[in-house]
């Protein structure tokens, strides 16, 4: 199979563990999921043959996760809310507290991530509004069998997902791609590790909605 001609979103759906590979090489499979593997690899000057070989290995493994391509949407939506929405609401306030501490205590150090707490607060505010709109408007429409009529709200949600992806790039820039200095304290290291976990969760969250839930809802699946 020539994986290079497939989009990152298609590959992430067909080979669930491919998402970890894409994160390893900083390939955006959620907001940038429509670009082909070849295009994405070319932008980052990655070895396309190596990526295809890794994908072939993953493709040969038996699936270990729930098949969201076939599961009822009424199962997928509660999973998204419990696994991702509720988790983000826990993650971000704690990360903001730690970021404020690191910026205050280490403000004179060159590697101090000045502005990180403010950026995380912006993400929390925007994401909170976004998730509320999904839970109060879009998800009830889909659960009521009105997915075909939800093109407008889905378009808005996808645009906001793109905005979230851009906000994550700001976080990566402020933190030197989540790389703490050699002499970083435990709070600093825990902060960057926690942000890394949040980014992983958010990318999985957006992937599940953009590449699976929304297309299936628009096709009128239940």
Curated annotation (Swiss-Prot):
Coiled coil: none annotated. GO terms for biological process: protein repair; response to nitrosative stress; response to oxidative stress. Homodimer. Keywords: Cytoplasm, Iron, Metal-binding, Stress response. The keyword Cytoplasm applies. Belongs to the RIC family. YtfE subfamily. Pfam families: Hemerythrin (PF01814), ScdA_N (PF04405). Signal peptide: none annotated. One of its GO terms (cellular component) is cytoplasm. NCBIfam families: FeS_repair_RIC, PRK10992.1. It is found in: Cytoplasm. GO terms for molecular function: metal ion binding. Its main location: cytoplasm. Di-iron-containing protein involved in the repair of iron-sulfur clusters damaged by oxidative and nitrosative stress conditions. InterPro entries: FeS-repair_YftE (IPR023742), Hemerythrin-like (IPR012312), RIC_family (IPR019903). Gene3D superfamilies: nmb1532 protein domain like (1.20.120.520). The keyword 4Fe-4S does not apply. It comes from Musicola paradisiaca (strain Ech703). This is Iron-sulfur cluster repair protein YtfE. It comes from the Bacteria.
